[in-house]
Design a protein with these regions (language model features):
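Active-site-proximal cap/lid insertion segments
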Residues: 1-98, 108-116, 166-174, 183-186, ...
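C-terminal cap/loop subdomain of S1 sulfatases and analogous C-terminal strand-loop tails that border
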Residues: 56-62, 83, 88, 99-102, ...
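Cysteine-centered loop/knuckle micro-motif
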Residues: 189
Length: 225
C-alpha cells in the first residue's frame, strides 16, 4: 500500500471521512422513506408524530475539528424535524432543547409530566402557538475531561444573538461571540470594553441557568472567577 504523509495523507483522510459521511446521509434518507411508506400504507401517517433528531451536530473541519462536543454552533445546533398531523408547517424560531422531548411525548400520550422534569413540552410550538414565557436562552455543560477526545471542560449560555463560553478546571478561558455579526465564531469579544454590558448580562444569565438546572460545578467555577 502507498504510504501517504503530510498534505496528501490529510486529504486522503478527509476524502475517506466525507465518503463515509455521505453514505450515512444516504442511508438515513432511505430508511426514513421506508418508515414513511410503512405508515402511509397502514393508514398511520395522520395519527403519528414523526421525529428526526440527533444528540448533537457535527464538525466537518470547522474550527479545525472533526467530531462534536465543543459548544460552537456546528456541534451545539442539533437537527430536529418534527411532523405533527395538523400541526404548524415551516420553521419554528423559538429555542428548544433535547430535554424538551420527554415532556412533549408525555403530553401527546396523555401522561402526567413530572414536576421536576427540566424540559418543556413542544406541543404548543408544534400547534403554532407562541407561549409568552418560553425560554430565551440555552445552557450547555461538557465535563468529560480528561478523556480520549481531549475536549476541555466547558459550560456556556446562548441566546438569540450572543454566546458565552467558559473553559474551566485546569484552564480559565472565556469566549464571547456575536452570532449575528460573527456566525462562524471566529472573533472572541470577551474582555473588550465595548462589550462590558453584554458580558455582564450573559454572565448573569449563565448563573441563573446554572441555578435553575442545579449545576453546582458550573456555579462554583463561575462564581469563583
Amino acid at each position: 500500500a502507498k504510504k501517504r504523509t503530510g498534505k496528501e495523507l490529510a486529504e486522503w483522510k478527509y476524502q475517506r471521512y466525507m465518503h463515509d459521511y455521505l453514505r450515512v446521509i444516504h442511508s438515513v434518507d432511505r430508511n426514513i422513506g421506508i418508515v414513511l411508506d410503512y405508515l402511509e400504507k397502514n393508514d398511520l401517517l395522520d395519527n403519528t408524530l414523526i421525529v428526526y433528531t440527533s444528540d448533537q451536530g457535527f464538525y466537518m473541519g470547522e474550527h479545525g475539528w472533526f467530531d462534536k462536543r465543543f459548544m460552537y454552533e456546528e456541534s451545539f445546533r442539533t437537527p430536529l424535524l418534527m411532523r405533527l398531523p395538523g400541526g404548524k408547517k415551516g420553521d419554528i424560531p423559538q429555542l428548544v432543547q433535547n430535554i424538551d422531548y420527554a415532556p412533549t411525548f408525555l403530553e401527546l400520550a396523555g401522561a402526567p409530566i413530572p414536576a421536576d422534569i427540566q424540559g418543556e413540552s413542544l406541543l404548543p410550538l408544534l400547534k403554532g402557538e407562541r407561549p409568552e414565557n418560553w425560554r430565551n436562552s440555552l445552557y450547555y455543560h461538557y465535563y468529560e475531561y480528561p478523556a480520549e477526545h481531549s475536549v476541555k471542560r466547558h459550560y456556556g449560555v446562548r441566546d438569540d444573538r450572543y454566546k458565552l463560553i467558559h473553559f474551566y478546571n485546569d484552564i480559565d478561558v472565556w469566549e464571547l461571540y456575536d452570532l449575528q455579526e460573527d456566525p462562524h465564531e471566529m472573533n472572541n469579544l470577551y474582555g473588550k470594553p465595548s462589550y462590558e454590558a453584554v458580558m455582564k448580562r450573559m454572565r448573569d444569565e449563565l448563573y441563573k441557568l446554572q441555578k435553575q438546572y442545579d449545576d453546582p460545578v458550573g456555579i462554583r467555577f463561575n462564581v469563583s472567577d
